[in-house]
Swiss-Prot record:
Involved in the stabilization of negative charge on the oxyanion by the formation of the oxyanion hole (site feature) positions: 117-118
Pfam families xrefs: ArgJ
Protein name: Arginine biosynthesis bifunctional protein ArgJ 1
Function per UniProt: Catalyzes two activities which are involved in the cyclic version of arginine biosynthesis: the synthesis of N-acetylglutamate from glutamate and acetyl-CoA as the acetyl donor, and of ornithine by transacetylation between N(2)-acetylornithine and glutamate.
Protein's pathway: Amino-acid biosynthesis; L-arginine biosynthesis; L-ornithine and N-acetyl-L-glutamate from L-glutamate and N(2)-acetyl-L-ornithine (cyclic): step 1/1; Amino-acid biosynthesis; L-arginine biosynthesis; N(2)-acetyl-L-ornithine from L-glutamate: step 1/4
UniProt organism field: Nostoc sp. (strain PCC 7120 / SAG 25.82 / UTEX 2576)
Disulfide bonds: none
Catalytic activity: N(2)-acetyl-L-ornithine + L-glutamate = N-acetyl-L-glutamate + L-ornithine; L-glutamate + acetyl-CoA = N-acetyl-L-glutamate + CoA + H(+)
Record site feature (Cleavage), residues: 190-191
Family statement drawn from the similarity comment of this UniProt entry: Belongs to the ArgJ family.
Active site residues of this protein: 191
Location within or outside the cell: Cytoplasm
Residues involved in substrate binding: 154, 180, 191, 277, 408, 413
Biological process per Gene Ontology, one example term: L-arginine biosynthetic process
Length: 413
C-alpha cells in the first residue's frame, strides 16, 4: 500500500510555491499560452531533457544553467512557438525572456529556467511575451496550478496535474506536478513538458539522481507515436519549506521521497499516454522474468510502441501474435518457450504455446476500455513473462486510431 495520499492543489500544493497561466497572444487561437511557477525561496533544481540532436533554445539554456547552479526560483513556459531550430536569434530570445522575468521578479536571471512548446522553427513572439510577463506576475497565486497547467498545453485534450502528501519525520511533505503532451511522445530523456514542485529539503545530487530514476520509470517508459521532441523537458524544484530535516544521503527517508516522486511522474506520464492524439484508451504493458529492470522496460516499451499492437487494440482485436512479434524484436534475448502473454484476465499464450480463449469476450474487454472512466477503467493491460529472471518493468502507450493521422495531417509541427 502506498505510503502517501492524493491531495488537491497540483504544483501549488507544496508549501512556498505560486503559479499562474494567462493568455499573452502567443497562440493564434487566443487560448492561454504563458505559464509561470515561482518558489518563494531559492530551491534545489534538477532537470532531464530531450536526447534529440536538434534541441530547442530553452533546452540548451536550462542545461547550461543547471550545470552552473543547481538551484532556481522560477520556471517560465510559453506555448505556441517551440523556439527550436531558430538559430542564434532563438538563443537570444530565450536569454531575453529570462532577463525580462528576472527584472520583474527582482531576482538574478541565473535563477530562471525556461521551457517552450509549439511549432518547430518558429521563434517566440517576443512582443507578446514582453507585454505578457507583468500580467503573468500579477496573476501569481498559491492556487494557480490549474491556470498554469492550462497555459502549457497545445494539442492536449485535457490538462494533467497531481499532488501527493506523505510524512517525513513528523511533518507533512508534498510533491505536485503538471505536464503537457499528446503527440511526439517517445521521450528519451513528446512535445513532453513536466514540472514538479516539492517542499522537502534534499541535497542537489540526491534530487538529480531521484529525478533521473523517476524519469526512466515514467516519462521514458511512455510512447504515443515514436517521435521524440526537440523540447522534451522535466524540471523539478525542492525548496525545503516543509521544514523537515535535510535529506543528504540514501536511506529510508530518501527512498520514501523518491517513491512518491516516481508516483507523481508515473501519474503524469500515464495521463500523457492516455491523451495521445486520437487515442481511445491507455495501454499498460507489464513485463516480468527479464534479466534486469532495463531489459524488462525495453521489451515493454517496444510492445507499447508497436503500431501493429496499437492498431489491433483500436480495432478491438485480441491479436496476441503482434504482441509476441514486438517482444521478439525488442533486442532483449529470451527463450521463446518461456514466453507467456496475457490480455487483461485472458491467458493467450503460455510456455510458448497458444491457448484456447474466448475471442469475443477478449474483444469485449478491449471495447470496454474505450468507454471506461478516465485513467481507471480505460486501461488495456498486457502482461508478458519472458523467463524466470528478477527484472520487471512497465511501459505505457495508447491505441492508434484514424484520428491520429487526421490531427497530424492538419497540424503544422
Amino acid at each position: 500500500m502506498a505510503d502517501w495520499q492524493e491531495i488537491t492543489g497540483g504544483i501549488t500544493a507544496p508549501k512556498g510555491y505560486r503559479a499562474a497561466g494567462i493568455t499573452a497572444g502567443l497562440k493564434p487561437s487566443g487560448l492561454p499560452d504563458l505559464a509561470l511557477i515561482v518558489s518563494d525561496v531559492e530551491a534545489i533544481a534538477s532537470g532531464v531533457f530531450t536526447t534529440s540532436q536538434v534541441k530547442a533554445a530553452c533546452v540548451d539554456y536550462c542545461r547550461q544553467r543547471l550545470q552552473a547552479k543547481q538551484s532556481a526560483r522560477a520556471i517560465l513556459c510559453n506555448a505556441g512557438q517551440a523556439n527550436a531550430a531558430t538559430g542564434s536569434q532563438g538563443i537570444k530570445d530565450a536569454e531575453e525572456s529570462a532577463e525580462l522575468l528576472a527584472k520583474e521578479l527582482n531576482i538574478s536571471p541565473e535563477l530562471i529556467l525556461l521551457a517552450s512548446t509549439g511549432v518547430i522553427g518558429q521563434r517566440i513572439k517576443m512582443d507578446a511575451l514582453r507585454n505578457g510577463i507583468p500580467k503573468l506576475i500579477a496573476s501569481l497565486t498559491d492556487t494557480g496550478s490549474d491556470a498554469a497547467a492550462g497555459a502549457i498545453i497545445t494539442t492536449d485534450l485535457v490538462t494533467k496535474s497531481i499532488a501527493l502528501e506523505t510524512t517525513i519525520g513528523d511533518r507533512p511533505v508534498r510533491i505536485g506536478g503538471i505536464a503537457k503532451g499528446s503527440g511526439m511522445i517517445h521521450p528519451n530523456m513528446a512535445t513532453m513538458l513536466a514540472f514538479v514542485t516539492c517542499d522537502a529539503a534534499v541535497s542537489s545530487h540526491l534530487w538529480q539522481q531521484m529525478l533521473t530514476r523517476a524519469a526512466d520509470r515514467s516519462f521514458n517508459s511512455i510512447t504515443v507515436d515514436g517521435d521524440t521532441s526537440t523540447n522534451d523537458s522535466l524540471i523539478a524544484l525542492a525548496n525545503g519549506q516543509s521544514r523537515t530535516p535535510a535529506i543528504t544521503e540514501v536511506g529510508a527517508e530518501s527512498e520514501k521521497l523518491e517513491a512518491m516522486l516516481t508516483a507523481v511522474c508515473q501519474h503524469l506520464a500515464k495521463a500523457i499516454a492516455r491523451d495521445g492524439e486520437g487515442a481511445t484508451c491507455l495501454i499498460e504493458v507489464q513485463v516480468t522474468g527479464a534479466h534486469d529492470e532495463q531489459a524488462a522496460r525495453q521489451i515493454a516499451k517496444t510492445i507499447a510502441g508497436s503500431s501493429l499492437v496499437k492498431s489491433a487494440i483500436f480495432g478491438r482485436d485480441p491479436n496476441w501474435g503482434r504482441i509476441a512479434a514486438a517482444a521478439g524484436r525488442a533486442g532483449v534475448p529470451f527463450e521463446q518457450e518461456n514466453l507467456q502473454i496475457q490480455l487483461g484476465d485472458f491467458l493467450l499464450l503460455d510456455n510458448g504455446q497458444p491457448l484456447p480463449f474466448d475471442r469475443a469476450a477478449a474483444s469485449a474487454y478491449l471495447k470496454q476500455a474505450a468507454t471506461g472512466a478516465y485513467l481507471q477503467q480505460d486501461t488495456v493491460l498486457i502482461s508478458v513473462k519472458v523467463g524466470n529472471g528478477h527484472g520487471t518493468g512497465k511501459a505505457w502507450g495508447c491505441d492508434l486510431s484514424y484520428d491520429y493521422v487526421k490531427i497530424n495531417a492538419e497540424y503544422t509541427t
